[in-house]
Structure formats: structure tokens, C-alpha cells
Amino acid sequence: MPQAFLLGSIHEPAGALMEPQPCPGSLAESFLEEELRLNAELSQLQFSEPVGIIYNPVEYAWEPHRNYVTRYCQGPKEVLFLGMNPGPFGMAQTGVPFGEVSMVRDWLGIVGPVLTPPQEHPKRPVLGLECPQSEVSGARFWGFFRNLCGQPEVFFHHCFVHNLCPLLFLAPSGRNLTPAELPAKQREQLLGICDAALCRQVQLLGVRLVVGVGRLAEQRARRALAGLMPEVQVEGLLHPSPRNPQANKGWEAVAKERLNELGLLPLLLK
């Protein structure tokens, strides 16, 4: 029988480390509370092979994550850019979605201590803002908006970036596992909880348009919102991953054309 991994036993909710607490400040505080609620619900799930270790950067990278939400989620948002889940060299290191280290530190201006996950894979160490490896997806994503908007405040005036699922899954070898690679029953349990949380988060922020970054994020957003919030528009954006051949042919140009099609460029150039 494959060993079942109980998320709560792999990754205790930061108790001995530092119990996450939302920061004061209305909307940001409420958003953080929703994330902690999601963490609590996910901690009850069990995962078996091929999952070896689970990282939750919303817990061990709580300080920079809280700083990100507090700084850039101070008011309602018209547009939510939705990623799927953390990457090993992005949010897993910094607590910020698509969180390539230099972009997080130097453009977004987010800092804060990153703790060590309770169980860490030797091939995927968490080094926080000292991580020397760049996440290509995050560098492309935030680099594009840096070039387009100039200052992060311009981007975040109308937009926010969030991941549907806060968990990073690693195989025993250390290989990154996407949620799509999980056993079907476990995947649907996981994403069902995340879908419900997304509906609450979209309602909280007053979002009118969700842009799924990558096909899976777009599909899940459509599925989550169609029944409960059909008034929210859902569209897709090509994922900037280097594993995506189309993205390697000039993702920035593709992204700009897509945002123009969606009528978003005026919001991002103010």
C-alpha cells in the first residue's frame, strides 16, 4: 500500500515556528484570514504517491507573503491574475505568486524572513530571498508588468496576483508535481476546496475579471465561478513557463496582445 501523507503532519501550521496572524487593515486582513481558512481546510487532506513532500509557503514564508498582501491589496480589484500553485524557485522561496527573487526584492520591494519548511527536500532547499536560482516564469511575468507599468503601484491599482492553490508538491526524487499529476480523487478534493476559496476571495476583492495564467488555472476558475458567480468574466493568458514552446517565442509580445484584446492596457498604463 502506498503511504498516505497527511498534510497537517508533514507541515504543521507554523505553531512552533510562528503562528500566522493577519495584519490589521480591513481588506488585506480579510484576504489573509481567507488564506488561513484555506490552509486549515487543506491541512485535513491526505496525499499518497506520487507525493513525497508538501511545501506551504503561505506558512513558512508568512512574513513576506503578509507584506505582499498588506502592501498591494489595500482596496478592491477589478482584475485578478490567477496562477495555479507555487513553483520551487518562485513562491516557494519568497511567498509571493510568480515570486522570482530579484523581482520580489527589487521591484515589488517585498522583504521578510523565510523560515525552513518542517520537512525539506535536500534537492529543493528553501533559501528565501537568498535563493540564487531565478524562476523564469516569474521573471517573465513580473518583468513584463514592470516594463509596462513602470511602478508596481500602477499595476496593483486595479489588479492583484494570486494562486489558486498555495501548496507545492514534490515527488520523493524532488521533482515538482503539478496538481494535474495528483491521483484523480486527491486532486479533485484539493481543487474543490481551492475553488470554493477562490469564490470567496473574488467576492471579497470585488473582482470583475479573472485572468487564468495557463490553461489549467483558467479552466479551474471557469469551473469554480460559473455556478456561484456567473457575472465574473474568466479569460486566459498564455503561461510564461519555459516548458511552454509558445512562451519561448516571445511571451511578452503575446501577453501584450492578449491584454489589449481584453481591454486591460488602459488600466495598466495609468
From Swiss-Prot:
Matches recorded under Gene3D superfamilies: Uracil-DNA glycosylase-like domain
Effect listed in the UniProt record for changing residue 98 to L: Impaired the damage-excising activity for U/G, hoU/G, hmU/A and fU/A
Record key words, sorted: DNA damage, DNA repair, DNA-binding, Hydrolase, Nucleus
Pfam families attached to this UniProt entry: UDG
Record bears the keyword Iron: no
GO biological process, one term: base-excision repair
Annotated GO MF terms: DNA binding; DNA N-glycosylase activity; identical protein binding; oxidized pyrimidine nucleobase lesion DNA N-glycosylase activity; single-strand selective uracil DNA N-glycosylase activity; uracil DNA N-glycosylase activity
Effect the entry attributes to changing residue 90 to A: Loss of damage-excising activity for U/G. Weak, but significant activity toward hoU/G, hmU/A and fU/A
Effect in UniProt of substituting residue 87 to F: Loss of damage-excising activity
Family that this chain belongs to: Belongs to the uracil-DNA glycosylase (UDG) superfamily. SMUG1 family.
PANTHER family given in the database record: SINGLE-STRAND SELECTIVE MONOFUNCTIONAL URACIL DNA GLYCOSYLASE
Protein name (Swiss-Prot/TrEMBL): Single-strand selective monofunctional uracil DNA glycosylase
Organism: Homo sapiens
Upper classification of the organism: Eukaryota, Metazoa, Chordata, Craniata, Vertebrata
